[in-house]
């Protein structure tokens, strides 16, 4: 039986029976798959930490085409992001980001961009500490890549770019941009929409320089959270504790 390798971030980890654990990766090259590590929870040789959420791992697995999951030969821990996980907020951030990625990443599909986005977000947060500003950046990049959020900022009514208008609004319900020339705008989203537009074309560090005000990121994150509720039909399990802890609930 052929042995294959995959590198990725663990976005789902759950116990099976008394000693097994099932994990799922946002992988570097392969489609999203489930891997079972038999007996790892009782093993004295294999480290259970290698199946922890948010860890960067390399999995050696048996390529069993007929099964819904792959049996692992070995799981090698590459990086745990210890600096990020050493405090409560950082740990909650990892749990939130991995759950969000898991919800957006369908089984059997191949999205290496999500792996790059997730690993990059964890890496920069591990090096520089968690910043709230990364939340809307991650969500917007992930949602646009998966085709859920529009990437062109044109008014649904007149077809002109809303970024050039006096005011603009994003309707979560209809997932459309509206401009002040065509509609009365009771809540102006224009500063946030300009932030979104920049996020889609610049690195996170550059976005922070161009848009230094935290309030714009907070409002952008609120809009994207509303969008996620509409898209998923529910709140993420990790949402309440995470947002309560960072003071944005």
Curated annotation (Swiss-Prot):
Gene Ontology BP terms: DNA recombination; double-strand break repair
Zinc as UniProt keyword: no
Q: Which InterPro entries match?
A: ARFGAP/RecO (IPR037278), DNA_rep/recomb_RecO_N (IPR022572), NA-bd_OB-fold (IPR012340), RecO (IPR003717), RecO_C (IPR042242)
What Gene3D superfamilies is this protein classified in?
Nucleic acid-binding proteins (2.40.50.140), Recombination protein O, C-terminal domain (1.20.1440.120)
* Transmembrane domains' residue ranges: none
One GO cellular component this record assigns the protein to is: bacterial nucleoid
Keywords recorded for this protein, A-Z = DNA damage, DNA recombination, DNA repair
Q: Which family does it belong to?
A: Belongs to the RecO family.
Checking HAMAP family in the record gives:
RecO
Q: What does this protein do?
A: Involved in DNA repair and RecF pathway recombination.
NCBIfam families for the chain: reco (TIGR00613)
Instruction: Return the protein name.
Output: DNA repair protein RecO
Identify the species of origin.
Leptospira biflexa serovar Patoc (strain Patoc 1 / ATCC 23582 / Paris)
What taxonomic classification does the UniProt entry list for its organism?
Bacteria, Pseudomonadati, Spirochaetota, Spirochaetia, Leptospirales
